[in-house]
Amino acid sequence: MDELQGHIAKAIDKFRAKIAEDENLRKELADITRNVNVDTTDNEGFSFILDKGEIKDFKKGKLPTAEITLHATTLDFKLLFTGELKPMKAWATKRLKFDASLDDVMRLKKLIS
């Protein structure tokens, strides 16, 4: 497992803990299924499936179709996961981009905050 993959795995663990303790978030995600790609613009990227509040099939490589795609360099993702780069600053400076519906963007904000 490379360094970025480890950071993403830790973020998934935090997400699972957040879901376990937040009943409102569980209810909000109960009927949601999304394919998610983490596109490292300088590498092959990662993917997972958000399925009714659970993250499944986290792996290296991108899914052929995804409702949510996050784009950044490997370094910027590492800085985001270590807290050295704040998500809103990364987005405002276009170091973090995403392809997703507005509803999904708002859900992502809840999950990473």
Label every PLM stretch briefly.
Residues 1-113:
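Feature captures hydrophobic
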